[in-house]
Amino acid sequence: MQAKIGPIRLSEGVSRFNAATYLYACIICIGILAGLNFIQPYILSVVLDIPRSEQGSVSGSLAFMQEIIAIISISLFGVLSDRIGRRPVMVFGTMVVALGFALFPYATTINELFIYRSIFAIGAAALSSVLAIIVNDYPTEQSRGKFVSLHSVLNALGVAIFAAFLGRLPTVFTNIG
């Protein structure tokens, strides 16, 4: 018997738990990927003491570098997920994103910031590729549109939640001293 989540029919071999875990990952992963951009101004201002007049250039360069890394590596992670499975690539991506996210606030120079953002970018490429693959793997053909829509809504919700939470952290840290 085919599993369902509400009106969404899942492909053979995909359990409701698999789908629920994936949908949770849509909120968390995309929220974290976007979340780095919400804490970056605080790190540039307070941790690295970069003048506001230079922060746009640094932020743009960091974003550009992350996109280049994504363009170069995302197809590699797609192929890798076909060869070794979605789970190992997703676990790798999650661990590497966590490492980059954890190191990012400890950067003492702009060069370190670029190194830590590169680490984050590699994990982000792995996560992004697997999330895009699974959204097509899990539903049946008849339910694909509904599942993609739910995936997109949860991505947006994740960004909003993390923006609200992480966007307040600089104020909290500043008030603490």
Predicted regions and their residues:
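Paired small-residue
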Residues: 100, 111-119
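C-terminal ends and interior cores of transmembrane alpha-helices
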Residues: 95-108
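Central cavity-lining transmembrane alpha-helices of secondary-active solute carriers
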Residues: 60-78
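Core transmembrane helices of Major Facilitator Superfamily
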Residues: 119-131
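Pair of pore-lining "gating" transmembrane helices in MFS-fold secondary transporters
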Residues: 9-46
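Helix-breaking motifs and short loop linkers at transmembrane-helix boundaries and internal kinks
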Residues: 85, 106-111
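Primarily marks hydrophobic transmembrane alpha-helices of the MFS/SLC 12-helix fold
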Residues: 87-90
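Glycine-rich segments within core transmembrane alpha-helices of 12-TM secondary carriers
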Residues: 148-171
